[in-house]
């Protein structure tokens, strides 16, 4: 309350007009005085309730303050003032998608944004994300295709398109998309790793191992790539390589990987192997 009174005292000394409050809000926002900026925009709106920019920037400030429900409503008010404005719909959609996890509302906002800017990459991509998170993979893929129409070599659209095909139960299409993402970012850990997971599930184990090895060249500290490679080697009967990979995984995350190895039937062929048992014993929970 003391802070609020201090801000009000300073601002009330200024000419009592919409423009002065609005400009003061912009100045305070640049200084990252978000609460002071919020007060200023709200005072501006008392004089000019139908001002698009005051509602829009109020939404930005509320986002900065972590007040996401209020931010979405402020963007909605801005959109009511200027229904044909892309940004109020897009930013409102981003709040619903990323912060509030209200994916259907996010989609409705992105659709409105796209109606005003049909070829926009970002609204199409984020619409795809909302559909993917709702498990509506067909529409997610259609949205990613729209995004790729704007940016044909966009890594994220190809990668998330791969995620959608994977979760939709189409591993071959997923592999194609991850490989395309890799063409754009050859040193991307995740595209290599996701290919490995799919190839492992398809029992194409040597190919899966090759992908895990590539991912580990980029990030040697990933426990799951080491663990999954160990599983592949164990399934192929290559016990020494399986143990070596498992050792790396256990050195990074002994509790999780140790529990997985103790309960995974793929290692049943190693249960009588002294090195394997010693390895698990050394990394057993204290």
Predicted segment positions?
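Terminal, low-structured helical/coil segments at or just beyond the last alpha-helical repeat
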Residues: 4-10, 257-286
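Residue-level recognition of tetratricopeptide repeat
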Residues: 26, 60, 94-95, 129, ...
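Register position in tetratricopeptide repeats
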Residues: 30, 64-65, 98-99, 133, ...
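Canonical tetratricopeptide repeat
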Residues: 23, 57, 91, 126, ...
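Helix-start (N-cap) detector for alpha-helical repeat units in TPR-like alpha-solenoids
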Residues: 18-19, 52-53, 86-87, 121-122, ...
